[in-house]
Amino acid sequence: MTKQLPYGRATLSVSFPEDLNVEWVQPDYGPGAPDPSALLAECLRNPIGSRPLADQARGAKRVAIVIDDITRPTPSRLMLPAVIRELHAAGVAAEGIRIVVGVGSHRTMTPAEIAEIVGEDIFPRYTVVNHQARDPQHLADIGRSPRGIPASVNRTIVESDLAVLTGFIKPHNVAGYSGGYKAYFPAVSGIDTIVGLHDLQKLPGEPCRLGEIDNPFRAEVDAMGPLVPVPTFLLNVVINRHKQIVRAFAGDPRQAHQAAVAETVKRATVPVSQPADVVLAGGGGYPSDISLYQGINALTSVVRLRKPLVKEDGQVILLGEFREGLGSEFGSGGRHKDLATAWASHLKKMRRLTVVSPNVPHEPLAAAGIARAQSAEEAIRRCAADYRNPHILVMPDAPYTVGLTG
């Protein structure tokens, strides 16, 4: 049996031995909207829990729009024009619009990358800036979270009359689901805020899990959102594996996000017969598999669940292009010292992790006790040989999947 798995900007052909017990686990997000521009306009003009965007923007001189960075497949090329049209209809001039790229602690984006995600029509006409999480001059302190985490946000936001948060919804290994006020925290917040929030995943009992929205991280983010002293409007979308917009939700950041998550839960959740001996977790293609750091989203779709999809004595194969290697988040200047430290809690939940990618160096993998294979077929053959009649799960779009065992 041969299947095509998302890999970088293309697909990778992977052959599975016919004698193996293979279970295919893939969500169905549905077809893309026939007219996404009309869909976006409709939800911006008929939002959930708030006035239409144009009404809120009327009289505003400065508006900040927060967008996702290159590591997310958010269709900003479609979303930005829809938002900007409403702002112009309200009388906001192009000079008054600032687009802030929510890179969080990731590397900043190049001009070419910015043009790619916002579109050639937007980039030269509107100001687009990378967030700077480590530069105090670019940050404004706005208080503390309920747990005492210092809250800071990009200064462009607080100097605006209105902020528009954009993003897409997917299962998230710490927040439960992405989107909502997460576009503020951690996307455009200071490094102390980012570290404080991510430390919540280390709380005893691992209360922050994939696909569970009721958790300390999300509660903290949602409590911090109203600290931002600017009226905030949200636009979140649900996309399918082809990066097409399926549904769109706009309005009050809490209410619109809750509606978007409820829709995503129905589409992302897939029943799984039982925990497997071997799980092949695909990185989901570009940009989800841009680096091994982003590959954590595929790995946690297997292990960071109330009921992990791999047995305690099982193995996980992580497949992705990982064109940027480990990612800028590791090593000097990064948020993590090394791979072994960053992934320690995940690695202890399985016998072995094997990475399949030509772009990840051997040394940091070996130092973390992670195996490496030249091909998916080699990894499958090697892992399956350790079991008698192994049960194998294949998750082509692991970062977008919530597998539920009985």
List PLM regions with ranges.
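Internal helix-turn-beta structural module
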Residues: 341-401, 405
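Short glycine-rich or small-residue beta-strand-to-loop segments that form or flank ligand, phosphate
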Residues: 62-73, 98-104, 280-282
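Conserved, well-structured core segments that form the ligand-binding/active-site neighborhood
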Residues: 124-275
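Short internal beta-strands
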Residues: 94-105, 315-321, 351-358
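Histidine-anchored nucleotide/phosphate-binding helix
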Residues: 73-92, 298-310
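A glycine-rich helix N-cap at a beta->alpha junction
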Residues: 114-139, 340-341, 345-348, 358-359
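N-terminal amphipathic/basic leader segments beginning at the initiator methionine
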Residues: 1-44
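A glycine- and small/hydrophobic-rich beta-loop-beta segment
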Residues: 247-349
